[in-house]
Amino acid sequence: MEERAAILLLAHGTPDSAEEIPEYLRNVVSGRPMPAEVIEEVRHRFVEIGGSPLTALTLQQGRLLQEALGLPVYVGMRNWKPYIADVVKQMVEDGITRAVAICLAPQNSRTSVGLYRRAVFAEAGQKMQIGFIEGWAEDDLLAAAFADRLRATWEPFRAEVGGPVPVLFTAHSVPCRTVQAPQPDPEAPRRPVLPPDPYNYEAKKTAMHVAAKVDGLDAWYFAFQSQGMSGGPWIGPTVEDTLTALHQEGIRHLVIQPVGFLCDHVEILYDIDIAFRDFAQNLGMMLRRPASLNDSPLLTAALARLAQSGLDRLQASEAPEPAAS
């Protein structure tokens, strides 16, 4: 059989219309009941921004990566079409024998990378060799891509203000239970205990790497955004609490830079551009956001390097053992 390689990009997914939001949310929470008021709020946000461009932008990122690599690039979504299972099935039908899967959530977490990984391997089985990129929060080209966007907003804003302008880095919050270290089960003492989830640490490491690439940055802070509207507690500090604290310290101008998202979608276009901006304005603060990475050449370069590295590892794992001398 002829060996054929490809790349698989994995993302969260978004519905195509407001009418599909209830079904989409059922996928997000694995079929658990969702309060009607939560469904209505999500629908409101979706409509307010004119629909989410996440799928279209992710497909564009795939096309750019395909041009850079000269290899087929597929895109699969966990919570909406094109579903990961359907895309992996198509890859097998297309004769793909090995692939590198890259989760477009750079910071590793059991709620992102772990779920995507299970979805890919559940369908691929033994039909295709998969190399999975576990997390790339500290990738130098990723940091350079964010820094490039940040610089383009922060420098002119600082010149306009005529004084210091701090930066607030953000990443999507996750449930507290996700990142808490599991405790040994006294009823099953031999059951292995998973290590703490790395997400909290990795999100802040990304921010640190981005900040280091922007010369003269006045100060920077970190918060978790877009906490869930139902369920138990989610990790913080929240953006709202952080904005309030910074206002009390006398800060009136701020750049907010999300570092966990690679393209525009609801959490940027609504949560940041509408909700957080209105919240800041009510405090008497001016908030600006850099452009999202979307079609950033540096992001394409980062993905290409990750993909090639993954392909090289797959190739090496297939290489025969050297003959004994």
Swiss-Prot record:
Chief localisation class: cytoplasm
Any single Gene Ontology cellular-component annotation: cytoplasm
EC number: 4.98.1.1
EC class (word): lyase
UniProt record, GO biological process: heme biosynthetic process
Superkingdom in the source lineage: Bacteria
Pfam families from the UniProt entry: Ferrochelatase
The protein's annotated pathway: Porphyrin-containing compound metabolism; protoheme biosynthesis; protoheme from protoporphyrin-IX: step 1/1
Segments forming a coiled coil: none
Keyword Cytoplasm attributed: yes
Stored Gene3D superfamilies: 3.40.50.1400
Catalytic activity from the UniProt record: heme b + 2 H(+) = protoporphyrin IX + Fe(2+)
Localization annotation: Cytoplasm
Sites where the protein binds Fe cation: H172, E267
GO MF: ferrochelatase activity; metal ion binding
Protein keywords: Cytoplasm, Heme biosynthesis, Iron, Lyase, Metal-binding, Porphyrin biosynthesis
Function: Catalyzes the ferrous insertion into protoporphyrin IX.
Family per record: Belongs to the ferrochelatase family.
Name of the molecule in the record: Ferrochelatase
Origin species: Acidobacterium capsulatum (strain ATCC 51196 / DSM 11244 / BCRC 80197 / JCM 7670 / NBRC 15755 / NCIMB 13165 / 161)
